Regions:
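Iron-sulfur-associated redox domains of electron-transfer enzymes in respiratory
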Residues: 1-344, 353-356
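Ferredoxin-type iron-sulfur electron-transfer modules in oxidoreductases and energy-metabolism complexes
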Residues: 107-109, 322-342, 360-455
Length: 455
């Protein structure tokens, strides 16, 4: 049975009390589903508004399930599973807990009504707790009424043919000043010698473009080509070129790296997407000073010093100021803001192409068996794309701003990413890219992770 079948049942007779909410429950097979079954066999009663979907473990409940449920007409969603320490798969609920912490903060940033999204630990012996939880959620949503704003979004299936692109308060244009000054002699010499000696077989850097008014990312393989390098002033992130499977086979690989590229390389190393031993870093400080040819560990030590500890690294002060201004607004205003921004999206995927972290073999938007979300640039398609992309980058985005600079619709993507980075730091003390030997945020957990929002 599919999610759509569960939350689109046969028409029910009109309720004598008026509005009857539709609630979708994603539950663990071993605990909560058994608890709900116990409630039934014990002849306990609770509202029939809930449609229950059983999955093997809460660790299997993807955030896309929650998004899909809301877009398919649910007025409320609840996720429930085993208590910590009782998971039949050892740590599935621990991983789920970290995932839901991040998702709640993302939904709050977007202005989604968090009162409609509950999480609970319910064991197989807690049939009474299941009844109480469903009764409480149903009563709460009845008071809130239908989720009209989400229903309107889900019904918006007509893409805007000519989206209106205007300057926004929260949008900040990344530097694209067209600087094509030649690279420093020290950098050119170091790259040339590395290619001559075999310390690097290919070097990724910035070169002058004959057609663009700004540097372009390129890779060179001969010592003579090193003279074509220019100062690394482009707004993109050179680490994204490492997504190229052909380039990644040419090892050892050199890269002209600023702090944003070093952070990105560390994240890729954490995820075993690159081998630090095969990477040669031509370190360039953010002020343009060449720091020498070093390995990734040394580059991390020398270039990531004196970073602020009170906010995520990589993001500018202006981005966090914009985020703070947004979060000071009521949820309804935040929702309207992001709906206006999302409506401008033309689904060109320039944000995906410019991001060194977006490297899946097949993006969820390209999957059509099944097709979970609309591919058109319509209301639900754009909303799901930006929400899930931001979530997938939680704990991974280094704040380089390449996505925002590449966006032709001028959507403030870095603000969403900053919200996720702040959530990762606040709840888990995680800073993306500081340690190449660290653990990826969403693949890790701690038994004492926050759970005060779980029933």
């Amino acid at each position: 049975m599919t999610v759509a079948q569960v939350i689109k049942p046969e028409p029910m007779a009109p309720s004598p009390t008026g509005f009857e909410p539709r609630i979708v429950a994603f539950v663990c097979k071993w605990c909560t589903y058994a608890g709900a079954d116990l409630a039934g066999t014990s002849r306990m009663t609770y509202p029939p508004n809930v449609r229950t979907l059983m999955l093997p473990c809460t660790g299997r409940i993807d955030v896309s399930f929650v998004v899909r449920a809301f877009l398919q007409g649910a007025d409320g969603v609840i996720v429930s599973g085993c208590h910590p320490g009782d998971c039949h798969y050892t740590a599935g609920n621990y991983r789920a807990r970290r995932r839901w912490t991040l998702l709640r903060d993302l939904l709050d940033t977007l202005g989604v009504d968090l009162a409609r999204f509950d999480l609970a630990w319910i064991s197989a012996a807690e049939g009474a707790k299941w009844v109480k939880t469903i009764q409480s959620l149903t009563d709460k949503i009845k008071k809130l009424g239908p989720y009209e704003s989400m229903h309107r979004l889900a019904a918006d299936r007509t893409p805007d043919i000519a989206p209106r692109i205007e300057s926004d308060l929260l949008f900040q244009v990344a530097s694209q000043d067209g600087n094509t000054a030649p690279a420093s002699p020290e950098l050119v010499t170091a790259v040339s010698e590395a290619l001559s000696s075999g310390h690097a077989k290919v070097v990724v850097g910035w070169t002058r473009s004959d057609t663009l008014s700004r540097p372009r990312p390129s890779w060179i393989t001969t010592p003579e080509a090193a003279r074509s390098l220019v100062e690394p002033s482009g707004s993109g992130n050179l680490a994204r070129l490492l997504k190229n499977p052909h380039l990644r086979r040419i090892l050892p690989l050199g890269i002209v790296a600023r702090s944003s590229e070093v952070l990105s390389l560390n994240v890729l190393a954490q995820e075993a997407q690159v081998d630090p031993a095969s990477i040669v870093v031509f370190a360039v400080a953010d002020d343009g000073q060449f720091r020498g040819m070093v390995d990734l560990a040394t580059a991390s030590t020398t270039m990531l010093q004196n970073l602020p500890a009170d906010r995520p690294v990589g993001f500018s002060d202006a981005v966090f100021k914009a985020l703070d201004e947004l979060m000071a607004k009521p949820p309804a205003e935040r929702w309207e803001f992001w709906m206006e921004q999302s409506a401008k999206c033309i689904k060109c995927y320039a944000c995906r192409g410019s991001c060194p972290m977006c490297g899946c073999d097949q993006c969820f938007t390209d999957k059509n068996q099944p097709q979970w979300f609309p591919t058109a640039a319509d209301g639900p398609g754009n909303f799901a794309w930006h929400l899930l992309r931001a979530f997938h980058l939680a704990g991974r985005c280094v704040g380089c701003g390449a996505c925002q600079a590449a966006c032709p619709a001028r959507i403030p993507l870095n603000v969403l990413s900053a919200a996720m980075a702040r959530s990762a730091l606040k709840h888990f003390g995680h800073q993306a890219g500081l340690d190449p030997k660290g653990t990826s945020l969403q693949s890790d957990f701690k038994p004492n992770d926050q759970e005060d929002f779980i029933l």
